[in-house]
Regions:
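Predominant activation on well-ordered alpha-helical scaffold segments within soluble catalytic domains
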Residues: 5-15, 36, 72, 94-97, ...
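Conserved C-terminal alpha-helix-loop-beta "cap" of PLP-dependent enzymes
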Residues: 59-111
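A generic structural micro-feature
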Residues: 4, 53, 105-107
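Glycine-rich beta-alpha junction loops
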Residues: 14, 35, 63-65, 86, ...
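Conserved PLP-dependent catalytic core of the aminotransferase class-I/II
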Residues: 18-71
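Amphipathic alpha-helix from the class-I
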Residues: 1, 5-23, 37-43, 118-121
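Localized chelating/binding microdomains
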Residues: 13-16, 37-38, 45, 71, ...
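PLP-dependent enzyme catalytic core of the Aspartate aminotransferase-like
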Residues: 93-141
Length: 141
């Protein structure tokens, strides 16, 4: 038996998405740009996400010489990960990043974060400030 109510719900969700998708993608791009404006100035910054061909709500980046797991553990006020949710139990570097040709060290230095429907510019400012504080502290150690 087909779940008619779920089919109708999916149809309505698709209609809503198509009506606001362009505006939402622009909003996410603006949030990502705000984040990058702050963190890209830090020493050793690199971005794994393609600069143009990507979903603007997900950003994969890191800092050369800074272990992603160390950054993850230090970032107590923000949500970042060293890989996808389905691989969150694994300690090793992301197999996806390795598959893209990144070295083991580069992949191990990478973290990912995302911007969602309810993420505000203030959330992004706060998150980027925390990343800046952590990286500056780790570099000084």
């Amino acid at each position: 038996t087909l779940a008619t109510h779920q089919i109708v719900g999916l149809s309505e969700a698709a209609k809503l998405m198509s009506s606001c998708q362009s505006v939402e993608l622009q909003r996410l791009q603006a949030l990502k740009s705000l984040f990058l404006d702050n963190v890209s100035k830090l020493p050793g910054f690199f971005q794994n996400s393609h600069p143009e061909n990507h979903f603007p709500g997900i950003l994969n980046f890191g800092f050369s010489g800074v272990d992603g797991e160390t950054l993850l553990l230090a970032a107590s006020r923000i949500a970042v990960s060293t890989g996808s949710a389905c691989n969150s139990e694994k300690i090793e570097a992301s197999h996806v990043l390795r598959g893209l040709g990144l070295t083991e060290d580069h992949a191990a230095s990478s973290i990912r974060t995302s911007f969602g429907r309810y993420t505000t510019a203030e959330d992004v400012r706060s998150a980027s400030e925390e990343i800046c504080t952590i990286i500056n502290r780790l570099i000084a150690e």
